Amino acid sequence: MKPSPITEHDHVDGPADAPVTLIEYGDYECPYCVKAFPVLETVRQAFGQKLRFVFRHVPKSGQAFDKQAAEASEFAAAQGKFWPMHAQLFTLDGHHDLEQLVAAAAAIGLDAASCRKALVERTFAERVRELSVAALHSGIIGTPTLFINGARYENRIEEPLLSAAIDRAIEAAAG
């Protein structure tokens, strides 16, 4: 199992020339992703410019709100606010309804009425579907799934373990 190459359609935080790229395939409704979020945020902050972080949607529960949360993040992305919305969605502890999603958008300064309209009309549904299909083609069947420089991270998502794996990847990249 390998992640697909990073494209301009991905949600990327960090420099392209960072020695380590960490890709997360995640789902805003997944309790394991919710639990992993603060660990990943801590790691992102700790490694700074040495780490490029990529988040890819895998809404898989079949619940309508599952896909709606991903669509809400895409609505925010279209306005340059993916990462603030990403954080807002994970702070909702995996429980989202239309009103919570609209409130999350408003909390980061987006227009609530525009968000509601985009979610009701499913403006970003096709984009989320395409991302989900791409994840399946990469062999992703569970969330969260992490890759460090293209290699699947197989350990528990705990800060000391993940940081150690990233440190090893930095050392390997340095030659």
Language-model segments: what does each one mean?
Residues 1-4, 175:
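N-terminal targeting signals for export/organelle localization
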Residues 3-20:
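A short beta-strand-turn-helix
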Residues 23-24, 28-106, 111, 116, ...:
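Structural alpha/beta surface segment adjacent to cysteine/selenocysteine redox centers
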Residues 25-26, 32-44, 103-175:
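C-terminal cap of thioredoxin/glutaredoxin-like
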Residues 17, 83, 145:
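Short, flexible micro-motifs
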